[in-house]
Amino acid sequence: MASMMSNAAVVGRTTPAQASMVAPFTGLKSVSAFPVTKKSNDITSIASNGGRVQCMQVWPPLGKKKFETLSYLPPLSEESLMKEVQYLLNNGWVPCLEFEPTHGFVYREHGNTPGYYDGRYWTMWKLPMFGCTDPSQVVAELEEAKKAYPEAFTRIIGFDNVRQVQCISFIAYKPASYDA
């Protein structure tokens, strides 16, 4: 048992530099140094936004499904659509079209937790348009998709192939049968 014990003595020494690293406690500050404001317990002193509440409206949740980025705006004109696609191209994103023939919005079919089959993933129209530099090419593909699937929702996404993320997504076409 004596062979297991060490004869080396451990000495813990503090240096003067360690003691001066933390400022010593000097006590609490005087209360007289702080301004004192008396708070009223009267309920009428609480700020009211009653004037603003009167002009607020609640978005009706039934019959007014909304989709993605530009869904609260009226349908895009062809000129506005071209500008959005040009913005996408100016940022170096790859345009891609996707369509959904039955549900143009997120829904829960196979449970109440988010999953693969809940409307987030749409069918890709052809391949991503790598190397596309002209918005009219994207709009021409959109027209082709509308002819092939006139009752499908179609969206344009902008994909950043460097960061491997989708940067923009908006509905470019809603079927005529959908009334919002």
UniProtKB/Swiss-Prot annotation:
Output the Pfam families linked to this UniProt entry.
RbcS, RuBisCO_small
* Annotated localization: Plastid, Chloroplast
Q: What's the superkingdom here?
A: Eukaryota
Is this entry keyworded Plastid?
yes
Which InterPro entries has this protein been placed in?
RuBisCO_ssu (IPR024681), RuBisCO_ssu_dom (IPR000894), RuBisCO_ssu_N (IPR024680), RuBisCO_ssu_sf (IPR036385)
TM helices/strands, residue ranges: none
Q: Name one GO molecular function term.
A: ribulose-bisphosphate carboxylase activity
Covalent S-S links between cysteines: none
Q: Does the keyword Cell membrane apply?
A: no
Question: What's one GO BP annotation on this UniProt entry?
Answer: reductive pentose-phosphate cycle
Reported induction: The least expressed of the 6 small subunit genes.
Which CDD domains did the record assign?
RuBisCO_small
Show the coiled coil region(s): none
Residue range covered by the transit peptide:
1-54
Q: Which GO terms describe its cellular component?
A: chloroplast
Mainly resides where?
Answer: plastid
Keyword tags? Calvin cycle, Carbon dioxide fixation, Chloroplast, Photorespiration, Photosynthesis, Plastid, Transit peptide
Q: What does this protein do?
A: RuBisCO catalyzes two reactions: the carboxylation of D-ribulose 1,5-bisphosphate, the primary event in carbon dioxide fixation, as well as the oxidative fragmentation of the pentose substrate. Both reactions occur simultaneously and in competition at the same active site. Although the small subunit is not catalytic it is essential for maximal activity.
The miscellaneous annotation reads: The basic functional RuBisCO is composed of a large chain homodimer in a 'head-to-tail' conformation. In form I RuBisCO this homodimer is arranged in a barrel-like tetramer with the small subunits forming a tetrameric 'cap' on each end of the 'barrel'.
Q: How does the annotation summarize its subunit structure?
A: Heterohexadecamer of 8 large and 8 small subunits.
Q: Which family does it belong to?
A: Belongs to the RuBisCO small chain family.
Instruction: Output this protein's name.
Output: Ribulose bisphosphate carboxylase small subunit, chloroplastic 2
Specify the species: Mesembryanthemum crystallinum
